[in-house]
Amino acid sequence: MIEYIRGELAALTPAQAVIEAAGVGYALGISLNTYTVLQGKREVKLYVHEAIVTGGRDDSYTLYGFATVQERALYRLLITVSGVGAN
């Protein structure tokens, strides 16, 4: 598992951050809270949640980034609720 990614912020939108680390650009879905924290920064560190979906035609591997460990923990708690997901 990926615990966190630290690197240069290559691109930022309210829904996504791209972090370049060791020559690889990682696209991570982010919250508006994390977006606010990242604005104006060059070097960043995001705590990662990996979402792997298999078993159908649309298998996917998605990364979500959070500004703090606490925000990631809250997200992980929320997705345990039936009917709640990343979108």
Predicted regions and their residues:
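Short coil-to-beta-strand transition motifs
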Residues: 1-5
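Long, highly charged, low-complexity intrinsically disordered interaction regions
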Residues: 11-87
